[in-house]
Regions:
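Structured beta-strand/loop patches that form or line metal/cofactor-binding pockets in enzymes
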Residues: 1-57
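N-terminal amphipathic alpha-helix/helix-capping segment at the start of soluble metabolic enzymes
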Residues: 1-10, 122, 126-140
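A short alpha-helix capping/helix-coil boundary motif
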Residues: 13, 94-98, 133-137
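Short glycine-/small-residue-rich flexible loop motifs, especially phosphate/cofactor-binding loops
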Residues: 34, 118, 156
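Metal- or metallocofactor-binding catalytic centers and their adjacent structured scaffolds
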Residues: 38-123
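Metal-dependent enolase-superfamily TIM-barrel catalytic cores that perform enediolate-based chemistry
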Residues: 130-188
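General structural feature for long, well-ordered alpha-helical segments within catalytic domains
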Residues: 65, 84, 88, 108, ...
Length: 188
């Protein structure tokens, strides 16, 4: 049985040097909200709460976590790492319905789920990827994201200089512009 003894939450906020333009808006900040759950063995499990957009989504989710989740997580116990997800997802159904905010609550529950699985794997002394799939690779590929269409060549060059070989650019504005951007990258 895993007993959660301590909770820490970290809100990171980074001002973008160049705002990221996407089909759903302009991102001037990048936020990351990380939950750390510490158990009776002093193991830490980490989970990230999705809060990429809008700009202040991280602070909003931080406040929801403090107001609704933190006290429930204190002294929370679980044996199966799937149990916390089910418990917290169901626990806030009425609030999600009343507020109409399914997204933020679900994002937080997902972050808790990741932290619980991480904690479970550490108690089993098994890397999480191997716990979930013993045949999973030891290394994963990464990609560069947040690349605006009008500066994709410069950003892709920067990423390549860091050893990154895969890229994700923003599309979804105008079909002809999107095709033109993708064709220029293909030639690039």
């Amino acid at each position: 049985m895993i007993h959660i003894n301590k909770i820490k939450i970290y809100l990171f906020k980074y001002k973008n040097k160049n705002p990221v333009l996407s089909s759903f808006g302009r991102m001037t900040f990048r936020s990351s909200l990380v939950i750390e759950l510490i158990d009776q063995n002093n193991n830490s499990g980490f989970g990230e709460v999705w809060c990429n957009f809008p700009n202040h989504a991280g602070m909003y989710r931080f406040e929801i976590f403090k107001d609704y989740f933190a006290n429930l997580l204190k002294k929370f116990e679980f044996e199966n790492p799937s149990d916390p997800f089910s418990f917290f997802y169901e626990k806030f159904n009425s609030i999600k319905i009343q507020s109409g905010d399914y997204g933020a609550f679900s994002n937080i529950v997902s972050g808790i789920d990741c932290a619980c699985w991480d904690l479970f794997s550490k108690n089993k002394k098994t890397p999480l990827n191997k716990l979930l799939n013993n045949n999973s690779p030891d290394k994963i590929q990464v990609y560069a994201s947040g690349i605006n269409r009008d500066e994709h060549k410069e950003r892709i060059n920067e990423a390549r200089n860091l050893g990154i070989k895969k890229f994700k650019i923003k599309i979804g504005y105008d079909l002809n512009d999107d095709i033109s951007s993708l064709e220029s990258i293909e030639k690039f």
